[in-house]
């Protein structure tokens, strides 16, 4: 029995944990106020996985849930205190080799503000317009379409 590999990420009201177990069977997820216990049989060899996580902060076990797919089990933990950032998933600072941050879904929601997003939207619009207007006539550049030989078109000497 060994822990399943997992990825996690933080949101304003929820913490998400994805246990990466393909073809899982007999999935059991137990949500407690400050602990999560996950177990299942996984893969074609029905290997037994068990993860016990002492959580960084409390959650609402009644409003937390999980969903199984063919590739993983996604747990959605409702934070006990909404809007509180979790700098890590576990209570202890110890590095767990089976647990990593899901940077594909990570979002720094603490710094979000409408003003910041409006600046980003303006920047994005400016970048889109940098390609120029397609209807603009550009001046002719001498030799741009010329098929004449340049000095760098000469034959290279053979290597010795």
UniProtKB/Swiss-Prot annotation:
Record-linked InterPro entries: CS_dom (IPR007052), HSP20-like_chaperone (IPR008978), p23-like (IPR045250)
Cross-link (Glycyl lysine isopeptide (Lys-Gly) (interchain with G-Cter in SUMO2)): 35, 65
Biological or metabolic pathway of the protein: Lipid metabolism; prostaglandin biosynthesis
GO biological process, one term: chaperone-mediated protein complex assembly
Molecular function per GO: DNA polymerase binding; Hsp90 protein binding; prostaglandin-E synthase activity; protein-folding chaperone binding; telomerase activity; unfolded protein binding
Modified residues (N6-acetyllysine): 33
Site (Cleavage): 142-143
Enzyme Commission numbers on file: 5.3.99.3
Main EC class the enzyme belongs to: isomerase
Pfam families: CS
Keyword field: Acetylation, Chaperone, Cytoplasm, Fatty acid biosynthesis, Fatty acid metabolism, Isomerase, Isopeptide bond, Lipid biosynthesis, Lipid metabolism, Phosphoprotein, Prostaglandin biosynthesis, Prostaglandin metabolism, Ubl conjugation
Domain of life per record: Eukaryota
Reactions performed catalytically: prostaglandin H2 = prostaglandin E2
Major subcellular site: cytoplasm
Record's comment on post-translational modification: Proteolytically cleaved by caspase-7 (CASP7) in response to apoptosis, leading to its inactivation.
Region of interest (Disordered), ranges: 124-160
Residues bearing the modification Phosphoserine: 44, 85, 100, 113, 118, 148, 151
Gene Ontology, cellular component aspect: chromosome, telomeric region; cytosol; nucleoplasm; nucleus; protein folding chaperone complex; protein-containing complex; telomerase holoenzyme complex
Family: Belongs to the p23/wos2 family.
Domain remarks in the Swiss-Prot or TrEMBL record: The PXLE motif mediates interaction with EGLN1/PHD2.
Role summary: Cytosolic prostaglandin synthase that catalyzes the oxidoreduction of prostaglandin endoperoxide H2 (PGH2) to prostaglandin E2 (PGE2). Molecular chaperone that localizes to genomic response elements in a hormone-dependent manner and disrupts receptor-mediated transcriptional activation, by promoting disassembly of transcriptional regulatory complexes. Facilitates HIF alpha proteins hydroxylation via interaction with EGLN1/PHD2, leading to recruit EGLN1/PHD2 to the HSP90 pathway.
Subunit structure: Probably forms a complex composed of chaperones HSP90 and HSP70, co-chaperones STIP1/HOP, CDC37, PPP5C, PTGES3/p23, TSC1 and client protein TSC2. Binds to the progesterone receptor. Interacts with TERT; the interaction, together with HSP90AA1, is required for correct assembly and stabilization of the telomerase holoenzyme complex. Interacts (via PXLE motif) with EGLN1/PHD2, recruiting EGLN1/PHD2 to the HSP90 pathway to facilitate HIF alpha proteins hydroxylation. Interacts with HSP90AA1, FLCN, FNIP1 and FNIP2.
Name recorded for this polypeptide: Prostaglandin E synthase 3
